[in-house]
Amino acid sequence: VQWTAEEKQLITGLWGKVNVADCGAEALARLLIVYPWTQRFFASFGNLSSPTAILGNPMVRAHGKKVLTSFGDAVKNLDNIKNTFAQLSELHCDKLHVDPENFRLLGDILIIVLAAHFAKDFTPECQAAWQKLVRVVAHALARKYH
């Protein structure tokens, strides 16, 4: 995938403002609340019985931070995302058997979280760059499935 200088700037500029722990926790919690069937991959996380339980679950918070920290690797390696996520793709495909559609859903939720947190900075141009990024990351994570 090719990135313009403007796209790179919009992505890295916004990423520098992101609180990975807070935005990661919110994104994963929203995924589990909005798309409850995704909860089956997190059975070991304990109580996911309600939005309040999910939002207060420390394991959801910790894994959300881990997910978004990993997403930061994509931001740092925009020109090599496929290889950056090769091992994670293998893990999610071969060991965890995660439906690759869930990567797209999480990407869409991340867009919503970023827009909510950075409304002033999240211009249509910024959104377009981030939509492209989450699409590329989702594709890289789903690569092992193809």
Curated annotation (Swiss-Prot):
CDD domains hit by this protein: Hb-beta-like (cd08925)
Transmembrane segments: none
Gene Ontology CC terms, in alphabetical order: blood microparticle; haptoglobin-hemoglobin complex; hemoglobin complex
UniProt-recorded Gene Ontology molecular function terms: haptoglobin binding; heme binding; metal ion binding; organic acid binding; oxygen binding; oxygen carrier activity; peroxidase activity
UniProt-annotated binding residues for heme b: H63, H92
Endoplasmic reticulum recorded as keyword: no
Tissue and organ expression note: Red blood cells.
Entry keyword annotation includes Metal-binding: yes
Alphabetical keyword list: Heme, Iron, Metal-binding, Oxygen transport, Transport
Domain named Globin: residues: 2-146
Pfam families: Globin (PF00042)
Listed InterPro entries: Globin (IPR000971), Globin-like_sf (IPR009050), Globin/Proto (IPR012292), Hemoglobin_b (IPR002337), Hemoglobin_oxygen_transport (IPR050056)
Gene Ontology terms: biological process: hydrogen peroxide catabolic process
PANTHER family according to UniProt: HEMOGLOBIN FAMILY MEMBER, HEMOGLOBIN SUBUNIT EPSILON
Subunit structure: Heterotetramer of two alpha chains and two beta chains.
Entry function: Involved in oxygen transport from the lung to the various peripheral tissues.
Family (UniProt): Belongs to the globin family.
Name listed for the protein in its UniProt record: Hemoglobin subunit beta
Species assigned in the record: Rhea americana (Greater rhea)
